[in-house]
Amino acid sequence: MGWCRGLKVQYINGQETEENIKTAFLELIQEKDIDDITISDIARKACIDRTTFYRHSLSIDDLVTSMTQEMIYEMQSVIMQTRKPAITAFPNVVWWLTTELSETPGREIMQSKYWYKMCEMIEEAYLLSCSADKRIWKHPDMEPRMMVRARYLIGGTLYSLAAMLSERFQGDEEDLVIVLMEEATRLERDVQKLCE
């Protein structure tokens, strides 16, 4: 059984290193332009060597792509979670948006001034909605309190998405921007009702 424990430790260490690499990259991208960041910069910031970096990513573009995809999946999951049960045309917007972002180079997405704010809000909303899933069956009264915050965060995220779409697509997707803004406004009303 010793080899099994060894594999588990190795896996945990690998996960921690991967998180350190991502954190280092996100810190660096706020300090300098993404095109000026090197693998040596990331390795230094994450306190690893270049060989260790290459065990986790083939290149900076590979790292950016995986981080972007991860964010898109989280975004899709948490938005659909907080939309229950009143789902209208919103899934179509999410489908288009996630498809568009999936096909857009990660560097372009991360260079948007709205990206970091979205990351923060989606991460917190994702954790809140997961916690709500686990706890509501034990404490039904917790749902309003937890989902108030989650819906508030998603409302802010939708405003950021609408702004990002306006910034990147210059009027080509005006209808989608309008839908996002309407959904954000609706979520704000939901929050107000839950707070009454």
Where does each model-flagged region fall?
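Short, Lys/Arg-enriched N-terminal segments with co-localized hydrophobic residues
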Residues: 1-8
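Residues within the helices of the helix-turn-helix
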Residues: 40
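An amphipathic alpha-helix adjacent to DNA-recognition modules
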Residues: 18-26, 30, 35-36, 44-47, ...
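Secondary-structure edge/capping motif, primarily at the C-terminal ends of alpha-helices
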Residues: 78-82, 104-109, 133-137, 164-168, ...
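C-terminal peripheral helix-coil segments that are non-catalytic and often amphipathic
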Residues: 2, 163-196
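Amphipathic alpha-helical packing segments from all-alpha helical-bundle domains
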Residues: 113-140, 144-159, 189
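N-terminal positioning helix adjacent to the helix-turn-helix/winged-helix DNA-binding module
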Residues: 10, 16-24, 145
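Helical hydrophobic small-molecule/effector-binding pocket
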Residues: 84-132
